[in-house]
Amino acid sequence: MNSLAIRVSKVLRSSSISPLAISAERGSKSWFSTGPIDEGVEEDFEENVTERPELQPHGVDPRKGWGFRGVHRAIICGKVGQAPLQKILRNGRTVTIFTVGTGGMFDQRLVGATNQPKPAQWHRIAVHNEVLGSYAVQKLAKNSSVYVEGDIETRVYNDSISSEVKSIPEICVRRDGKIRMIKYGESISKISFDELKEGLI
């Protein structure tokens, strides 16, 4: 920085008790000061300027504890097991619940395990977005292929029969989640660019 800017910032930061007269005259091309030059002003200015702390990159480290937010996103492609049904909660909001099965692929790690599919994994999907919930009820049926993107959450509730506290892991689709029905047998030439753009956004 030039010395004039440093001195002006020093004047602005100094108290009104010690008046400092700096007169500035404008020349043909530049500004210059007719006041005395203080060599310590530049050092004082650099000491008073607060430096911004450098941003630390976040890594996946479980030792960081509660301060680390982590990533808890799930992307599921599979077949619908239980058809979507809507429930009305006590607060008046509507939640759409259905299950999606994934798996059934062949396990190549076992010797002699030809044509032995792995058991399917079932995932409970809870759609808290009303628009996506109505889409799921209208479009999805049992055995239809679906793409689901949402957050992994654990719902804790009290069992009314045994009075035990139970927890259920589920994939919650909220405002930033996605649900798309996957259609087989369609030619790529029949799909418009708007539909492709909608699926990517």
UniProtKB/Swiss-Prot annotation:
InterPro entries linked to this entry: NA-bd_OB-fold, Primosome_PriB/ssb, ssDNA-bd
Gene3D superfamilies: Nucleic acid-binding proteins
Domain SSB: from-to ranges: 71-184
Origin: domain of life: Eukaryota
GO cellular component, one term: mitochondrion
Compartments reported by the entry: Mitochondrion
Keywords of the record: DNA-binding, Mitochondrion, Transit peptide
One GO MF term attached to the UniProt entry: single-stranded DNA binding
Listed GO biological process terms: DNA replication
Function recorded in the entry: Binds to ss-DNA.
Protein name from the UniProt record: Single-stranded DNA-binding protein, mitochondrial
Organism name: Arabidopsis thaliana
